[in-house]
UniProtKB/Swiss-Prot annotation:
Residues 485-616 are annotated as: Disordered. ATP binds at residues 17-25, 40. This is Homeodomain-interacting protein kinase 4. Signal peptide: none annotated.
């Protein structure tokens, strides 16, 4: 067992958690405290020296943050010797990608997605206060702290790609954001700001629900094509201003066309670049609204007599999709900010409370909401309060005092659920097409194992009238996308340079949108009331770049395109005085009508008829 030491402490290296191109992450024992830590180890050379200096600068900027309240990883110390650099962080359990992999990439319930989203938004809000862009938000960089003791409590990690707005030119990263989570302004070469992280978080939310990346592009053309096919083309003025528009779009040959631009066809792209576009999506959505129809999301709306619990869960999912739509806009100026997202009804549970407060689903969601914000040794500190000023988490406590808590706690709905081991998706809904990826990201097979996802729903509707006969929905079953073995995501052949740093919008500490007075009449009007966010994160990055933060990964994502840092200008763009309109994708068509079923009289109908005939 190797040993290394700083000026003040000594560390025993227990095991190597992961290795990367430029270093490794090891699990170590800190002798002074007896705690296990994560040690990020990089070789001592000129290139890595610049990387370390950038990360240390950001960690220094965040030294005043409380890592627990800000949901960022706790940094302990840095030291070096003649051969290596060492950064010591707290040891966390696993990242969201590893968690998904353990559970066969089964869809995560909306209430758990809210718990994760809330914490990441708090982190982004605090980073914005410090004028920091994370620039590499993805499942691998969101870590579960301790899933047994604190379910779905997370922290943001890996600040190797992060940058301070005013000093972003000194960041030596060869790319901005991992491709699957890359914002349109980065893809198109438009001015960008901290809202690139909001786009990434929206993609992560969709992926947690789908069990598969929303836009898993093999290259930037595929990435833009996927977004266009789901959300429609960007507005013409966006493409007029975009430096890289000609890479993906061409002028419309029809002068009378509504949009003077059109997306290049796959054949055009192949002829120009000799690179064949690939289809790697599992769910080919024609609008973001269709997200709620995947993985049984619309079951409650199609039941003859929907259960209250099913209705509550479906309403929650619908609210989540509305937030995702606000996060995934072509135009960054139309995109919701972290502080406004914290007040969105999905995150604050405002709509759920108003319409479904008496359901077990609401109580369970409330409990998860409260626990995610609770810091050990401190009372829970709510981010969002009810309209009357009462913190939402107290609603559950008041009900427990009134005797309702005992009923809720004894209910099977309050048992901590594990994600099912198999995905279940409903086919032939609207225009949604389910398709096995022609080129698997992780490998994928079909099985005959039936998902147990609907077990809680079936239990909830026990005793209610169900149709006696009728066709069942056509189901598509997907097993682990690892195909029973851990297969690495292989990077595509041939990367192209991609310089994006010249697009930066230099921001002040507070955006103009946050200076408006809060009238409190709606969640959007109070968007400047951001929640506290906090410090950075550590150890983890897949094969997307030189930093080795995500080394615990067995499966790696493809390498995004690189850019030449020397091409970055030294001058900064002034804040633009133009305002662009957002683009909303086409809305999904209504669900096809179900076939009518012969139903018996509802419960209680016989006694009612007897009552009527008895009076006549």
């Amino acid at each position: 067992m190797a040993t290394t030491q700083s000026e003040t402490d000594c560390y025993d290296i227990i095991e190597v958690l992961g290795k990367g191109t430029f270093g490794e992450v090891a699990k170590g024992w800190r002798r002074s405290t007896g705690e296990m830590v994560a040690i990020k180890i990089l070789k001592n050379d000129a290139y890595r020296n610049r990387i370390i200096k950038n990360e240390l600068k950001l960690l220094h900027c965040m030294r005043g943050l409380d890592p627990e309240e800000a949901h960022v990883i706790r940094f302990l110390e840095f030291f070096h010797d003649a051969l290596k650099f060492y950064l010591v962080f707290e040891l966390l359990e696993q990242n969201l990608f590893e968690f998904q992999k353990e559970n066969n990439f089964a869809p995560l319930p909306a209430r758990h997605i809210r718990t994760v989203t809330l914490q990441v938004l708090r982190a982004l809000a605090r980073l914005k206060e410090l004028a920091i862009i994370h620039a590499d938000l993805k499942p691998e960089n969101i870590m579960l702290v301790d899933q047994t003791r604190c379910p779905f409590r997370v922290k943001v990690i890996d600040f190797g790609s992060a940058s301070i707005f005013s000093e972003v030119r000194y960041v030596k990263e060869p790319y901005i954001q991992s491709r699957f989570y890359r914002a349109p302004e980065i893809l198109l070469g438009l001015p960008f700001c901290e809202k690139v992280d909001v786009w990434s978080l929206g993609c992560v939310m969709a992926e947690l629900h789908l069990g598969w990346p929303l836009y898993p592009g093999n290259n930037e053309y595929d990435q833009v094509r996927y977004i266009c096919e789901t959300q429609g083309l960007p507005k013409p003025h966006l493409l007029h201003a975009a430096r890289k528009a000609h890479h993906f779009f061409k002028r419309n040959p029809h002068p009378d066309a509504a949009n003077p631009w059109q997306l290049k066809s796959s054949a055009d792209y192949l002829a120009e670049t000799k690179v064949r576009p690939l289809e790697r999506r599992k769910y080919m959505l024609k609008s973001l609204d269709q997200i709620e129809t995947v993985n049984g999301g619309s079951v409650a709306s199609r039941l003859t007599f929907p259960d209250r619990e099913a209705l509550a869960e479906h309403a929650d999912l619908k609210s989540m999709v509305e937030l995702i739509k606000r996060m995934l806009t072509w135009e960054s100026h139309e995109r919701i900010s972290p502080s406004a997202a914290l007040r969105h009804p999905f995150v604050s549970m405002q709509q759920l409370r108003n319409a479904h407060e008496t359901t077990h689903y609401y109580q369970l969601s409330l409990r998860s909401y409260r626990l995610s914000l609770q810091v050990e040794g401190k009372p829970p500190a709510p981010v969002v309060a009810a309209e009357d000023g009462t913190p939402y988490y107290r609603l559950a406590e008041e009900k427990e005092a009134a005797g309702m808590g005992s009923v809720a706690s004894s209910s099977p709905f309050f048992r901590e659920e594990k994600a099912p081991g198999m995905q279940r998706a409903i086919d032939q809904l609207d225009d949604l097409s389910l398709q096995e990826a022609g080129h698997g990201l992780w490998g994928e097979t079909c099985t005959d194992v039936v998902s147990d996802m609907m077990a809680p729903l079936k239990a909830a509707i026990t005793g209610r009238h169900m149709p006696d006969s009728g066709p069942e929905p056509i189901l598509a079953f997907y097993s682990s996308r690892l195909a029973g073995r851990h297969k690495a995501r292989k990077p595509p052949a041939g990367s192209k340079s991609d310089s994006n740093l010249s697009n930066l919008i230099r921001l002040s500490q507070v955006s103009p949108e946050d200076d408006r007075p809060c009238r409190g009449s709606s969640w959007e009007e109070g968007e400047h009331l951001g929640a506290s966010a906090e410090p950075p994160a550590i150890l983890q990055r897949d094969g997307d770049g030189p930093n080795i933060d995500n080394m615990t990964m067995e499966a790696e994502r493809p390498d995004p395109e690189l850019f030449d840092p020397s091409s970055c200008p030294g001058e900064w763009l002034s804040e633009p005085d133009w305002t662009l309109e957002g683009v909303r994708g086409p809305r999904a068509q209504g669900l096809p009508p179900r076939r009518s079923h012969q139903h018996g009289p509802p419960r209680g109908a016989t006694s009612f008829l007897q009552h009527v005939t008895g009076h006549h």
